[in-house]
A protein has these predicted regions:
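Short, T/G/N/S-enriched strand-turn elements that build extracellular solenoid repeat scaffolds
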Residues: 11-16, 32-38, 53-59, 73-80, ...
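Well-ordered beta-strand segments characteristic of repetitive beta-sheet solenoids
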Residues: 1-5, 20-27, 41-48, 62-70, ...
Length: 268
């Protein structure tokens, strides 16, 4: 199936389905409100903008290749492939909040992302290693899951508060500007957890690297928060406030290089 045009409205339970490949090239593509685009082979989407929100669904058994300038998946939109997903936003915005899902057991290639909103139950996941590089990332209450390793490169701010979860099973590397991991935020890995940020707010949050944890931050607020590793833990920061039940712990070597440490009713 090949469709070309200035715009395409497949919303309100519209269906585009094929046993073979689906190729859609248009301006604005509206697949919202239970719209469905499916293929037993691959799907290619080229559009200025894709509205896949309110339970829209794009699913392929083969490769799913989407070249867009904006993607809105809020309200349960689904973008999935059994083989692999390539998503190029050309600097545009990705909205995947409120239950949006981007997932594949195969390779997940995310290119030229601008601002990313994956909050309030949004999920971006792959069974393979993947990298998410973006201008900013809002993952408040969202999930970023790498069943292998996960790399985040965020130019501005990363907000993982309100029980956000960022996990790379084999390893997690995060480089960002300001990082908010407060109020139940979790950065976790069964391997090495490596975090580099400007100011880090970890009040009531947790950073856990089972193999090791390396953290470098301009300043760290760890009041009521947890930094922990079953291996070694290395912390480099300016001012560190780990009072009020904050904990910094390691079963292996613990190395702190800080300008000032506040530890009232904290644990080290």
């Amino acid at each position: 199936v090949t469709l070309k045009g200035a715009s395409l409205d497949n919303s309100r339970s519209g269906v585009i389905s094929a046993k073979g490949a689906v190729d859609i090239r248009t301006g604005v593509l509206d697949n919202s409100r239970n719209g469905g685009i499916g293929s037993n082979a691959g799907i290619t989407l080229v559009a200025a903008r894709l509205d896949n929100g309110q339970q829209g669904r794009v699913s392929a058994k083969g490769l799913l290749d989407a070249n867009l300038k904006g993607l809105d998946q809020r309200g349960g939109g689904v973008l999935v492939s059994e083989t692999g997903v390539t998503l190029d936003l050309n600097g545009g915005t990705l909205v995947n909040r409120d239950g949006g899902l981007i997932a594949t057991p195969g390779a997940l290639l995310l290119r030229q992302l601008g601002a990313v909103d994956n909050g309030a139950g949004g999920e971006i996941s792959s069974d393979r290693a993947f990298t998410l590089a973006a201008a900013s990332l809002d993952n408040r209450g969202g999930r970023l899951i790498g069943a292998a390793s996960l790399t985040l490169r965020i130019a501005q701010a990363l907000d993982n508060s309100l029980a956000g979860v960022i996990s790379g099973a084999a390893g997690l590397s995060v480089a960002t500007g300001a990082l908010d991991n407060a109020e139940g935020g979790q950065l976790i890995s069964q391997g090495v957890l490596d975090v580099s940020s400007a100011d880090l707010d970890n009040r009531g949050g947790a950073l856990s690297g089972k193999q090791s944890l390396r953290l470098s931050a301009a300043n760290l607020d760890n009041r009521g928060g947890l930094l922990t590793s079953d291996g070694e833990l290395e912390l480099t920061a300016g001012r560190v406030d780990s009072a009020d039940g904050g904990e910094i712990s390691a079963r292996g070597d613990l190395r702190l290089t800080v300008e000032r440490l506040v530890q009232r009713q904290g644990r080290l």
